[in-house]
Amino acid sequence: RYEGITTAEIRAQVPGWSVWSHGCPDGESCPEVEQRCRRVIALAQSLVASQAEVGAVALVAHGHILRSLAGSWLGLGPAGGALFNLNTATLSVLGHERERRTVVRWNARMTPAP
């Protein structure tokens, strides 16, 4: 329903609107996004555990879901993604320090090798 209109146009209809706090009509609900993030995280952890020699899983997706995954990874829920700025074509790494989930690297620019 919000496809093709600007944030300002949405806020004219819904003051204070944010995708993080209000979501989008006819889109996934916040609980649905949270369930999807949890499934992706569980699958990634399962893959890492079963492929110990690899030790990493790469996820490629649109910015909002990657930000939602980061928020969920840290226990902030998908809305915690609002705290993370994410540019196009950047690298982010989620990991652990001991048993605590961490952000190892976020929004790192990829530059070609010299």
Regions found by a protein language model. Give the residues of each.
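Phosphate-handling substructures
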Residues: 1-39, 105
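Acidic, low-complexity terminal tails and accessory targeting/binding regions
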Residues: 1-9, 49-55, 71-114
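Alpha-helix N-cap/helix-start capping motif
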Residues: 38, 63-64, 88
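Generic structural signal for well-ordered alpha-helical scaffold segments
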Residues: 34, 38-49, 70
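Conserved short-loop catalytic and cofactor-binding motifs
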Residues: 21, 25, 57, 82
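Generic beta-sheet signal
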Residues: 53-64
